[in-house]
């Protein structure tokens, strides 16, 4: 992940699917990635990071990484996030991820998609992602979100979005998508 965020595409992947049983460490791994990306070069001195960097063949963790986190057990599409705090109301995973990645500028690209609950596709997702810095998207407990909204037909929209997001991220040299689902 750190190699890809650093812009290296050889022997790297842009998309990771972590699948283990409950209690298998998925959320802990996502938390590690979050702190590495959020703290950039400050994380170089954290215990164990030197080994990660050595194995990756890197001098340090890249700085200025845009990070977004979607947790399916926490996000509620009926109430959404924002709206009462001076930020736009966000009722979809793509609206929330866009907001976290680039604030109003990124959200503007998917605002209509969010309002109409229509998943964005490649060109729109590409505009939503920051172009000038590394980008890490973490998605945890996705199946919980899917099962909650299955009766509304929203689960297919999330699957379609994740597929389009995966393809868009693969086309970037410094973007990574990491998702977790229980085995």
Go through each PLM region and give its residues:
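Substrate-engagement module of ASCE P-loop NTPases
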Residues: 97-100, 124-131, 156-177
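Conserved ATPase-coupling elements of RecA-like P-loop NTPase cores
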Residues: 145-158
């Amino acid at each position: 992940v750190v190699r890809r965020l650093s812009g290296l595409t050889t022997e790297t992947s842009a998309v990771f699917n972590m699948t283990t049983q409950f209690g298998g460490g998925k959320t802990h791994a996502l938390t590690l990635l979050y702190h590495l990306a959020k703290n950039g070069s400050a994380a170089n001195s954290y215990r164990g990071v030197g080994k990660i960097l050595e194995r990756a063949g890197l001098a340090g963790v890249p700085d200025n990484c845009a990070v977004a986190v979607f947790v399916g057990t926490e996000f509620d599409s009926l109430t959404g996030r924002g709206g009462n705090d001076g930020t736009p109301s966000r009722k979809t995973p793509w609206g929330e991820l866009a907001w976290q990645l680039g604030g109003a500028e990124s959200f503007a690209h998917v605002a209509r998609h969010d309002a109409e609950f229509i998943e964005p596709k490649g060109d729109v997702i590409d505009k939503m992602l920051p172009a000038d810095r590394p980008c890490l998207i973490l998605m945890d407990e996705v199946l919980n979100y899917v099962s909650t909204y299955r009766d509304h037909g929203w689960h297919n929209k999330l699957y379609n979005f994740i597929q389009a997001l995966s393809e868009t991220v693969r086309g970037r040299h410094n973007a990574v998508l990491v998702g977790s689902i229980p085995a």
